[in-house]
């Protein structure tokens, strides 16, 4: 399989070890190479980037799925964290698969992109079922957002154990806020 990898952060430059991968570092180059090279799949990495750049990558996904030359090519989004609204926007753009990269304090080793083959659990709709529908996000600055609980009228900041072990898993189905959301203050 031939892969086109778009990584605007440049972090995957030294990590990809496959002759079947073409690496680009901008959405425009990605769209251009997708039309020229006709890869089997486009892998788009959403790293630690500005929110504006994240929006540009989501727009790229939509352009790939709407372009007559590229709409049949599978798109796989690699996210560094679980983010419900990003996954929803990717679904709306036509992305089929989302995979979450493990966060690690150690530098990442080489990635063989041929092992990024999506599994049924990576389907966008499956990932959305896992994430609590009340996850909301409030912009802090041009690069960061804080996660808040919509079931608690966006007044509770989420993080740590609650976010990772309840809100971002099927555990949200037993959450007291999910089961009894506040309607008004």
Sequence positions of predicted segments:
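Conserved phosphotransfer cores of two-component systems
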Residues: 36-37, 64-72
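Proline-centered loop/turn at the N-terminus of a beta-strand
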Residues: 2, 72-76
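Conserved acidic segment of CheY-like receiver
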Residues: 1-9, 16
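Conserved phosphotransfer microenvironments
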Residues: 40-66, 79-80, 86
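Output/docking surface of receiver
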Residues: 8, 23-26, 79-112
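Short, structured coil segments at secondary-structure junctions
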Residues: 17-19, 71, 92-95
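Short alpha-helical segment
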Residues: 29-32
């Amino acid at each position: 399989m031939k892969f086109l990898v778009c990584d605007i952060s440049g972090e995957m430059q030294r990590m990809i070890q496959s002759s079947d991968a073409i690496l680009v570092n901008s959405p425009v180059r990605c769209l251009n190479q997708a039309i020229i090279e006709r890869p089997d799949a486009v892998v788009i990495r959403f790293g630690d980037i500005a929110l504006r750049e994240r929006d540009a990558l989501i727009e790229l996904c939509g352009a790939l799925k709407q372009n007559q030359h590229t709409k049949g090519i599978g798109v796989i989004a690699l996210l560094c964290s679980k983010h419900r609204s990003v996954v929803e926007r990717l679904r709306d753009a036509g992305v089929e698969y989302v995979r979450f990269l493990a966060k690690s304090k150690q530098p990442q080793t080489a990635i063989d992109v041929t092992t990024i083959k999506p599994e049924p659990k990576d389907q966008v709709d499956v990932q959305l079922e896992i994430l609590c529908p009340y996850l909301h996000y409030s912009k802090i600055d041009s690069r960061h957002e804080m996660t808040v609980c919509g079931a608690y009228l966006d007044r509770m900041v989420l993080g740590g154990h609650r976010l990772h072990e309840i809100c971002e898993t099927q555990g949200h189905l037993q959450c007291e806020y999910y089961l009894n959301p506040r309607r008004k203050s």
